[in-house]
């Protein structure tokens, strides 16, 4: 089985790491993922992925990653050897440590204890059914509480170690990719999803799969299908996940075990978490740390369950606040029940039921606290102050958003002060990681503001998505575990505010806004600054997510860019060395090239001109962009661009049609595309303005998270805004322009009408209609007349001698260039030119076109812009075909500028926003 293979592989590769007996106790997938993850919990670019949702969902699994991020090098080195044992055993130790939180430090300290606890946790995990081994040994509540404490401790130590390893590993990132085929049974399971993941061997652990890697996988699955998959409230849904790991030469096929969800809150959350990937759920089990379903499952169970729960919650969260709230109520029940078992742990249980999810989220956060908690974690309340704080934070998250908000600064201070040295280093990393996660939570819970945002930031580093669902849950459950949440509140405050602050109210927004905070996390370095920026950006991101593109589109984009994103995704959420800005240009260039081609053929009038232009006839029409471009050049596209700029070069240039004819081919490649982009100066400006409201841009949650995390708040506001809107709009533009030429033209007319203040709407409408009609007629007439003339000339030339041929050749050039200089068409063109000139003389039309495109761009209607631009270009082309190369050259220059700026920024924006926010931010920042 995969578990055996993984065991063998882990035993072989993880020689330096403690092997945990939990492997035998846990399911194969759990062993595989858990061991591997624990083995190299710190390694994986997916950690950033994990930080987005999986970490949020699976704090423990991603805790190592977060720990890598948050744990200071000292802690990392100290926890280095422990991390495996702590990471797994901490999960398990929470199972054993539940009897006494004093066991937590011991368990954390002793790998053997951790292994035992890991087994206990595994038994508790059985509670999920999938993890029956762990589940059975420990009582549910006990496990939950212990899982919370142990999780915190192990995450703290393991996290430090992981972060340390990851910190070192980041320097020598080795990418390994595997594909994950996910299919959901029932509901939207008919969608087979295939993801390609890159595992980053940041630790240098032989590229072992880590929790973070698993988390990244699960998170990706979640991002793709998790939100679309709806699990019956207390029902279950099975997601089949097949993991094939090719880079290692080992392929893991993990048919996800159907995840039956137990009745009740645990069921529902566990089912969702399980739902994600049962195979991944096994992986996520270490990640989620048991899950709410596990309730009291030991840390491993908590890790798996919480991770599942996280996934379940994020899904519910995305699915609806109500459902998430239902889960919350269930968690509250479990939390209330768990606190009965152990109030400190009980709060952990709350955190476990509801907070426990947060424990996962805060686990790594708490692990930081936990390393001190391990140091002084004899009792969960005082010794486990870090753990308690963690649990309390979870409880606060679950139960006391207010307390979290109140305690957030205190918690942060406490969290930073208690392990002051480690914590600060950890805080630096955790600020980055947690801020990313917090950003996710904020994105999901925009409610998390000021102090809540601060509080959330640290805990968010662990489980942003999970925290997000738990946020409103915690808001709903604030009364539960208030005593401990207060002490834990300081820690929980950072993790909790995202949960608590988010509140159920924003849950629906979280579906859209859930990641809006990600731009918020743009300043991951300082919580306070980030809190302020995130608060500001959170508002923007809320808007951004409100205008978010279709999630399916984003998912497809994410899938396409998954590999690149994987490269981009680092544990720290910082752009890694492996994150190459070059990818941004490449990603952008492809869309740009496609969009250029589309744009070339996109505009109705240029295409019309191209089709009718003898130059187009001369040039293969099959090459629609070149043909359209050459044809349009004959009718300079540059003038439209200039016209868009408000410069009416066309009217002046119409007298130079013959010159333009010669340059048709030089300009062809640029003109149409630039013609469409010609308006793009305004479009670009509009897009930039629209992009300036970068948060309003449509960012997939994951991309938003990356964007927010990697790109500073300023960075997100800077380059990404301009680029993303352009990109997002670019592809649609050609489509609509091609499909809706008339509509685009009408939109052009409408935009002109709307811009009547600058120009009479009637004249402009008539102008547009006349232009289009005349252009089409003239072009057709041109073509016919040119053909006739050519035919006549050819016949005449054939009848005549070489002199006739000479005259024929003389005539042919104009005929061939008749699009610009056709005699009859020239007259018509002159009319159009005059008509256009008369209209253009009203300079407003071109500004109108420009402003209209800008409006359209702001509304993500680049299509309209392109249509308008195409029409404007067509108009300008009618003139421009008659206009000299001056217009063309100027147009080309303008268009080139526009091309680089608008097309790159548009594509840049599209790719940047939806695919590689951080990559593109780097590039765009450089570009910008």
UniProtKB/Swiss-Prot annotation:
Gene Ontology biological-process entries: negative regulation of canonical Wnt signaling pathway; negative regulation of Wnt signaling pathway; neuroblast fate specification; positive regulation of canonical Wnt signaling pathway; segment polarity determination; Wnt signaling pathway
Region spans: Disordered: 68-133, 291-368, 462-543, 578-600, 614-668, 779-825
Segments of this protein annotated with the region Required for nuclear localization and inhibition of Wnt signaling: 543-572
Subcellular location: Cell membrane; Cytoplasm; Nucleus
Compositional bias ranges of the Polar residues kind: 68-80, 120-133, 484-493, 812-822
Region (Important for binding to zinc): 227-372
Parts forming coiled coils: none
Bias (Basic residues) ranges: 84-101, 307-317, 353-368, 650-663
GO cellular component: cytoplasm; cytosol; nucleus; plasma membrane
EF-hand domain: residues covered: 188-224
Protein name: Protein naked cuticle
Source organism: Drosophila melanogaster (Fruit fly)
Taxonomic lineage from the root: Eukaryota, Metazoa, Ecdysozoa, Arthropoda, Hexapoda
């Amino acid at each position: 089985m995969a578990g055996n293979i993984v065991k063998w592989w882990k035993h072989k590769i993880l020689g330096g790491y403690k092997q945990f007996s939990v492997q035998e106790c846990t399911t194969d997938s759990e062993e595989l993922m858990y061991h591997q993850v624990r083995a190299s919990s710190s390694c994986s670019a997916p950690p950033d992925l994990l930080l987005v949702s999986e970490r949020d969902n699976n704090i423990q699994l991603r805790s190592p990653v977060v720990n890598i991020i948050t744990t200071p090098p000292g802690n990392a080195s100290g926890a280095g050897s422990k991390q495996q044992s702590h990471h797994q055993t901490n999960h398990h130790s929470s199972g054993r440590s539940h009897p006494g939180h004093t066991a937590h430090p011991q368990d954390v300290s002793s790998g053997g204890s951790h292994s035992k606890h890991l087994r206990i946790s595994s038994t508790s995990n059985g509670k999920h059914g999938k993890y029956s081994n762990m589940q059975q040994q420990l009582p549910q509540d006990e496990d939950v509480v212990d899982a919370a404490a142990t999780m915190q401790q192990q995450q703290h130590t393991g996290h430090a170690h992981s972060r340390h390893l990851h910190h070192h590993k980041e320097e020598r990132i080795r990418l390994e990719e595997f594909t994950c085929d996910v299919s959901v049974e029932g509901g939207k399971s008919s969608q087979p999803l295939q993801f390609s993941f890159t595992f980053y061997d940041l630790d240098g652990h032989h590229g072992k799969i880590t929790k973070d890697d698993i988390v990244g996988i699960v998170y990706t699955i979640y991002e793709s299908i998790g939100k679309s998959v709806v699990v019956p409230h207390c029902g279950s849904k099975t997601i089949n996940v097949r993991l094939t790991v090719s880079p290692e030469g080992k392929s893991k096929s993990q048919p996800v075990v159907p995840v039956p969800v137990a009745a009740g809150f645990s069921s529902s959350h566990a089912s969702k978490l399980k739902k994600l990937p049962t195979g991944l759920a096994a992986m996520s089990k270490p990640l989620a740390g048991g899950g709410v379903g596990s309730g009291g499952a030991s840390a491993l169970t908590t890790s798996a369950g919480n991770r599942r729960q996280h996934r379940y919650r994020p899904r519910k969260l995305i699915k609806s606040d109500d459902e998430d709230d239902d889960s919350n109520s269930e968690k509250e029940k479990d939390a209330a029940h768990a606190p009965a078992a152990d109030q400190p742990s009980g709060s952990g249980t709350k955190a476990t039921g509801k907070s426990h999810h947060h424990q996962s989220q805060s686990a790594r956060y708490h692990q930081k606290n936990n390393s001190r908690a391990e140091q002084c974690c004899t009792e969960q309340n005082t010794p486990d102050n870090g753990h308690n704080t963690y649990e309390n934070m979870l409880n606060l998250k679950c139960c006391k958003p207010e307390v979290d908000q109140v305690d957030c600064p205190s918690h942060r201070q406490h969290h930073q002060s208690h392990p002051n040295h480690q914590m600060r280093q950890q805080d630096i990393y955790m600020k980055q990681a947690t801020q990313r996660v917090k950003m996710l939570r904020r994105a999901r819970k925009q409610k998390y503001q000021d102090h809540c945002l601060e509080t959330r930031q640290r805990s968010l580093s662990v489980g942003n998505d999970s925290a997000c669902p738990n946020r409103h849950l915690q808001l709903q459950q604030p009364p539960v575990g208030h005593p401990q949440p207060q002490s834990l509140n300081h820690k929980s405050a950072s993790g909790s505010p995202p949960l608590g602050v988010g509140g159920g109210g924003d849950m629906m927004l979280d579906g859209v806004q859930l990641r809006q905070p990600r731009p918020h996390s743009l300043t991951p370095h300082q919580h306070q600054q980030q809190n302020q920026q995130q608060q500001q950006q959170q508002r923007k991101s809320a808007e951004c997510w409100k205008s978010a593109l279709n999630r399916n589109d984003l998912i497809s984009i994410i899938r396409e860019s998954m590999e690149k994103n994987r490269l981009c995704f680092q544990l720290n959420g910082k752009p890694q060395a492996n994150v190459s800005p070059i990818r941004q240009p490449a990603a952008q260039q492809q869309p740009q090239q496609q969009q250029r081609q589309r744009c070339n053929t996109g505009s109705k009038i240029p295409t019309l001109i191209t089709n009718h232009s003898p130059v187009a006839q001369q040039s293969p029409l099959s090459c629609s962009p070149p043909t359209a471009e050459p044809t349009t050049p004959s009718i300079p596209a540059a003038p439209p661009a200039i016209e868009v700029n408000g410069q009416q070069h066309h009217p002046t240039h119409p007298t130079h049609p013959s010159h333009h004819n010669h340059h048709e081919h030089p300009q062809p490649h640029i003109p149409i595309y630039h013609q469409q982009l010609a308006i793009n100066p305004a479009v670009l400006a509009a897009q930039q303005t629209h992009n300036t409201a970068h948060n309003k841009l449509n960012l997939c949650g994951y991309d938003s998270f990356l964007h927010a995390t990697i790109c500073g708040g300023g960075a997100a506001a800077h380059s990404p805004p301009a680029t993303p809107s352009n990109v997002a709009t670019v592809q649609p533009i050609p489509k609509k322009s091609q499909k809706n030429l008339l509509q685009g033209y009408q939109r052009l007319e409408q935009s002109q009408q709307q811009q009547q203040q600058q120009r009479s709407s009637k004249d402009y409408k008539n102008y547009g209609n006349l232009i289009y009609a005349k252009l089409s007629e003239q072009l057709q007439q041109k073509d016919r007349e040119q053909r006739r003339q050519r035919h006549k000339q050819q016949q005449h030339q054939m009848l005549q001698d070489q002199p006739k041929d000479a005259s024929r050749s003389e005539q042919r050039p104009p005929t061939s260039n008749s699009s610009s200089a056709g005699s009859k068409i020239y007259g018509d063109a002159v009319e159009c030119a005059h008509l256009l000139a008369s209209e253009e003389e009203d300079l407003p039309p071109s500004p109108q076109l420009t402003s209209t495109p800008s409006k359209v761009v702001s509304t993500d209607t680049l299509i309209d812009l392109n249509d308008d631009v195409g029409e404007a270009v067509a108009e300008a082309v009618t003139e421009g075909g008659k206009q000299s190369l001056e217009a063309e050259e100027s147009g080309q220059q303008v268009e080139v500028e526009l091309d680089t700026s608008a097309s790159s920024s548009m594509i840049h924006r599209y790719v940047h926003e939806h695919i590689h926010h951080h990559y593109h931010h780097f590039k765009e920042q450089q570009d910008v």
